[in-house]
């Protein structure tokens, strides 16, 4: 896209779609870029369905992955770096008249930071930022299609979804039985922790996966992706009509 093409697209758009994710380990069978590849693919589907209502931004590959740093290849940002990066993108878009941003987030570790970023964007920039993560948007569909009690990372669910959205990141010939699973505490363990505690991934698992990827099912992945895409599009169309905050900002 040239600057003149961008000028036309931004003039028509009511919102921007921004893909984010992470570069981190995903067990023995999935690539380091799994999260951003999935986030990018979902963002492309969303932007395509929205048409001229939205403009698709270049993706932000890196995210918050401190808890995976014992596994080689993982690259993490500090929370303040991640926040500054997203907010600078939002501020730049606002300069060109787009003050609503939907962050299509492929990484669960970014969720808490994105909540704070949304507040800061409204307070300091007068912009609306919404973030959606596929595992949250489709949580009810996922629960119907889960075969094991423990899942959450490089598991049958994430493998199934990636096989649909970004099959190039999945090496099915390397899928293996779970190894070295441990409980830290029943109330902090995935997939539904009841107590917030910082736990590092290597304290739960030796191979970097939580769940059994051998149980992946492409048809389940298709069903989850269909539900997530439909809900994301419905939300984005409503979001595009939400009134903007007063400038220069402020929680209203």
Question: Which functions belong to the PLM regions below?
Answer:
Residues 1-102, 108-252:
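Extended, histidine- and acidic-residue-enriched regions that form the cofactor-binding/catalytic faces
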């Amino acid at each position: 896209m040239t600057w003149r093409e961008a000028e036309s697209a931004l003039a028509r758009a009511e919102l921007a779609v921004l893909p984010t994710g992470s570069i981190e380990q995903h067990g023995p069978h999935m690539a380091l870029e799994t999260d951003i590849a999935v986030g990018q693919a979902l963002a492309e589907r969303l932007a395509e369905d929205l048409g001229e209502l939205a403009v698709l931004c270049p993706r932000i590959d890196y995210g918050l992955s401190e808890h995976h740093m014992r596994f080689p290849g993982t690259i993490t940002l500090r929370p303040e770096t991640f926040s500054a990066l997203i907010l600078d993108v939002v501020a730049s878009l606002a300069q060109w008249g787009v003050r609503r941003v939907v962050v299509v987030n492929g990484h669960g570790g970014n969720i808490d930071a994105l909540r704070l970023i949304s507040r800061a964007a409204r307070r300091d920039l007068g912009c609306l930022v919404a973030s959606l993560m596929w595992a949250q948007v489709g949580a009810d569909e996922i629960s119907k299609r889960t075969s094991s009690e423990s899942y959450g990372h490089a598991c049958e669910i994430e493998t199934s979804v990636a096989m649909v959205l970004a099959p190039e990141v999945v090496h099915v010939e390397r899928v293996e039985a779970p190894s070295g699973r441990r409980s830290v505490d029943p109330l902090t363990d995935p997939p539904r922790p009841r107590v917030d505690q910082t736990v590092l991934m290597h304290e739960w698992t030796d191979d970097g996966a939580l769940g059994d990827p051998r149980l992946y099912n492409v048809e389940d992945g298709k069903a989850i992706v269909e539900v997530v895409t439909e809900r994301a599009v419905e939300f984005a169309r409503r979001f595009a009509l939400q009134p903007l905050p007063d400038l220069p900002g402020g929680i209203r």
